[in-house]
């Protein structure tokens, strides 16, 4: 695309091409200028750590596009992906929230099935992105959801409502996969206490900090991911579905207040924003307490109707010992031979 022909869609410096020539980034005719090729030529790291994440969204919502550009993200084709695509269906806020939690599951880039996933199909890889073995460089996949995210959000904008009500930031701290997206209305003038500065910092844990509470729970789950993640998902869906279900009623009430006095609507939505954030953090603390009790020391205590089962007598809760997944045990035996074989003593 020639940027000079797209002034309604592109904002750029008058010297965007001449500066590239001056720096040696571009030497062709103006009509052939590519901003991306000049200022950020694609290398393997950019392809696999950045472009592949875009591909994952396309693959989720436009299957034909995903299939067509799989060779591109695998480094087998140089045909770049389109800037945007039309999804196969109309997407909801919940669709985008769930997409933010993707780790390439079910695709050729899935990282839950190889040795790096550990025994419990952990869809994460520790940084750095690359490593060397015997002088050869290798890489770790970088999916949409990663553990080092500080925050993520889905921005919802609706022209059929006043700006004060129509703009909502569905905001979550830490890894998108294991956070709760809570509504933050754009007219909010008071930051939720658990989101604000002053509660903990980069070297100080705080039970009043949403960032640290979400990190605490996520770091508990990752090492035993396949065993523990569904307990987290149950609470996450419970909260997010509640916020989604309540949205229409909340905004209807806000609209009535707005028509009376916009300041009343602001106060109402500010209180609601703060309440949702605090409710999620409080529930996440309860989740963390539940997880550490249920999965203590590698066992799994039994649950009935969402509650841990108490012993009929004594102080040992009913539990099971799930151990390691069968495939992992087979891999151990394959790697170690008879090292751990139980022998019959003569």
Where are the predicted features?
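Conserved small/polar residues in nucleotide/adenosyl-binding loops
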Residues: 1-6
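Structured mid-domain segments that build the active-site/substrate or prosthetic-cofactor binding neighborhood
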Residues: 9-238
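Charged low-complexity "KEKE/polyampholyte" interaction tracts
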Residues: 173-179, 184-346
């Amino acid at each position: 695309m020639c940027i000079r022909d797209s002034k309604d869609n592109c904002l750029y410096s008058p010297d965007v091409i001449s500066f590239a020539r001056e720096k040696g980034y571009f030497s062709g005719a103006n009509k052939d200028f590519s901003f991306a090729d000049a200022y950020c030529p694609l290398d393997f790291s950019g392809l696999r750590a950045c472009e592949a994440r875009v591909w994952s969204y396309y693959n989720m919502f436009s299957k034909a596009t995903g299939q067509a550009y799989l060779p591109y993200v695998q480094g087998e084709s140089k045909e770049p992906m389109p800037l945007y695509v039309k999804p196969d269906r109309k997407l909801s806020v919940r669709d985008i929230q769930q997409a933010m939690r993707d780790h390439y599951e079910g695709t050729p880039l899935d990282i839950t099935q190889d040795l790096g996933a550990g025994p419990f199909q952990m869809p994460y890889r520790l940084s750095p992105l690359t490593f060397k073995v015997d002088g050869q460089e290798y890489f770790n996949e970088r999916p949409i959801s990663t553990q080092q995210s500080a925050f993520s959000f889905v921005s919802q904008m609706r022209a059929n409502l006043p700006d004060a009500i129509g703009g909502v930031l569905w905001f979550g701290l830490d890894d998108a996969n294991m956070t709760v997206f809570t509504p933050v209305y754009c007219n909010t003038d008071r930051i939720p206490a658990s989101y604000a500065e002053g509660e903990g910092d980069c070297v100080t844990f705080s039970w009043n900090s949403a960032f640290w509470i979400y990190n605490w729970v996520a770091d508990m789950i990752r090492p035993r991911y396949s065993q523990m993640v569904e307990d987290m998902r149950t609470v996450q869906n419970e909260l997010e579905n509640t916020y989604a279900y309540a949205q229409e009623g909340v905004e209807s009430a806000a609209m009535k207040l707005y028509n009376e006095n916009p300041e009343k609507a602001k106060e109402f939505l500010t209180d609601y924003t703060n309440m949702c954030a605090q409710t999620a953090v409080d529930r996440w603390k309860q989740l963390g307490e539940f997880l550490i009790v249920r999965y203590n020391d590698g066992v799994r205590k039994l649950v009935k109707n969402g509650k841990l089962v108490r012993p009929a007598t004594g102080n040992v809760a009913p539990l099971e010992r799930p151990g390691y997944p069968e495939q992992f045990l087979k891999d151990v035996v394959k790697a170690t031979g008879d090292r751990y074989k139980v022998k019959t003593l003569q």
